Amino acid sequence: MSTTTRTLQAIKFDRDNIKLEILDQLLLPYSTSYIPINNIEDAFKAIKLMQVRGAPAIAIVGAFSVVVEVSNYLKQSDSNQKTIKNLNDSLNYLITSRPTAVNLANALNDIKQLLQKYNETDIIGEKIYQQIYDYAITLYDEDLANNKKIGENGLKYIIDTLTEQNFKGPFSIMTICNTGSLATSGHGTALGIIRSTYQALQKNNSKQDFWLDHIYPCETRPYNQGAKLTTYELDYEQIPFTLICDNMVSSLINTLSDDNKKPIKIDQSAPVKFIIVGADRIVENGDTANKIGTFQLSTIANFFNTNRFNTTATATNKQIKFIVAAPKTTIDLNTKTGDDIVIEERPANELTTLVGPLLNESGKVGEKLTVGIATPGISVWNPAFDVTPHELIDSIVTEDPHVFTKDKNGEFNLIK
């Protein structure tokens, strides 16, 4: 199924006909196309290939794929009966598609928990199906509601922070990867906070002495989710933004925060006051696994917050809060520190090649090409995620009205 109309709906689930489609995010922003997910194997491939990505979204797709597979099985009249053990084996297999993101494992383990009341040799029937269906629907609906709460809570934290700093005037926010509607059931986590903040704090409607002027999404190499997906969402929402490469962050922040320096080819100079990121796993002490490059952003924020630059007259402009935004389902209290998080490594060709459509001089989209950008046969290290130490995180915003901040000892208390 294809459409020429842009949409921010990453997951389409037909609750009446039990059909699941996902937006193929590998084709964005040049083509909007939905692909069917007919079973668990389809979901595994789509998640592994990153046709769907974002910790909340892959959990939802994983759960819905189980619903679709069981529904299709129950419609069959053949004698190939599936047992609880068969389904548990399929769930364990699906978990391995993206090991770092805890949401997928949590959702599928919840389904496994539903199955524990049955014997492994029991045949899957309508009662089991209805329980799985109800769980998946609740997962989707709660994620959407929680994302909106994350946006509201993040907005309040931003207002409180800037008010406490007695900050006035325009400010900017920086983010990495994609954490919006394309990574969730809707609205988003980190991008959801940005969306909520822009709605409330535009220059022409802000009730505060400050307003959100600009967003800086990082390109997010090597998969370019920031360039392809976050810009797609920001453009759709008509939120002012400028795309930057991952290695431009320090220079941009320094330039924007100094009144004596004028940005080159940037028509505004609102200082970056917040770096807001998502999370694929937050462990008990607050260490956070997120898209590769997140750790780097936290160290840059820490540099500007503690460096000698803060003795200047523009010290307030250089104070940057590093915020992690995620639903509480992303918090893993069974893992003590970030050292224990399994980091997924991606194929070398994702770093040594670029994949995208051929564009002619008029910008018309042509065939998809793979272009080499590195010496063939070289050694490549390509982790999908890194771990940001809790020491470098200022706050963790969830759907809980209480924003998690550190105590006087610099420790988070993330007990749900």
UniProtKB/Swiss-Prot annotation:
- Which Pfam families does the protein's record reference? IF-2B
As recorded in UniProt, its EC number(s) are: 5.3.1.23
User: Keyword Amino-acid biosynthesis on this protein?
Assistant: yes
Q: What class of enzyme is it?
A: isomerase
Instruction: Report the record's Gene Ontology biological process terms.
Output: L-methionine salvage from methylthioadenosine
Its domain of life reads Eukaryota
UniProt-recorded Gene Ontology molecular function terms: S-methyl-5-thioribose-1-phosphate isomerase activity
Subcellular localization is given as: Cytoplasm; Nucleus
List of catalytic residues: 280
Q: What is its main location?
A: cytoplasm
Give the reactions, separated by semicolons, that this protein catalyses: 5-(methylsulfanyl)-alpha-D-ribose 1-phosphate = 5-(methylsulfanyl)-D-ribulose 1-phosphate
Is Isomerase one of the keywords?
Answer: yes
Family recorded in the similarity comment: Belongs to the eIF-2B alpha/beta/delta subunits family. MtnA subfamily.
HAMAP family associated with the record: Salvage_MtnA
Question: What protein is this chain from?
Answer: Methylthioribose-1-phosphate isomerase
Organism of derivation: Candida albicans (strain SC5314 / ATCC MYA-2876) (Yeast)
